[in-house]
């Protein structure tokens, strides 16, 4: 999937599609554990689960000018105040700036990756966060999403992370974000295996819309942006 001129592997940024002159970028962040100091591997299930998202996002983007990459974590866990995946995400953004310049970037994160994406949203390159079944404990900071777009999809039947806590975070973020939307995926689970095609297609369409709002339709209905009950799709 990687284009010509791609750098060798290693480091926090792993390019999957690398145009010669990117105008924008998408970084994908997989899930992990609350605590875990063992090394993160690309063959761990949390990382493997995001591969269909890589393919779906790539299929919906113009390869000639949008860079697609994943963030490589050093460790498997969040690890308390260390917030190791946030450090890795910020390092990936630093490397991205070296590679492509200060291009507008969308972060797509699942579970722990959604938490890392939220925390890294204040980076000057980040324009939007797409959080999938995010792990957002009560009281997560939202000041850093000021001026950014926030899209959240959470499985209606998720028993690992809390749709209610995601909804509470989105409500607080609406006071500072450019726009904030949330939808529940009907019958959806944390691993995003039930209705997997819907997860993949809706995520890819949301990313395409965030990068080209005038040219690509928003896959989410207007109710997702309102203050009422979170709609079920």
Where on the chain are the PLM-derived regions?
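Alpha/beta-hydrolase active-site loop
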Residues: 79-99
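Short alpha-helix in the alpha/beta-hydrolase fold that links the catalytic acid
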Residues: 41, 162-172
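C-terminal catalytic histidine-bearing segment of alpha/beta-hydrolase fold enzymes
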Residues: 4, 178-233
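Short, surface-exposed "cap/lid" segments of acyl-processing enzymes
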Residues: 2-63
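Acidic catalytic loop of the alpha/beta-hydrolase fold
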Residues: 156-162, 191
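Short beta-strand/loop motif that positions the catalytic acidic residue
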Residues: 145-146, 151-158
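Gly/Ala-rich beta-loop-alpha elbow adjacent to hydrolase catalytic centers
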Residues: 108-113, 117
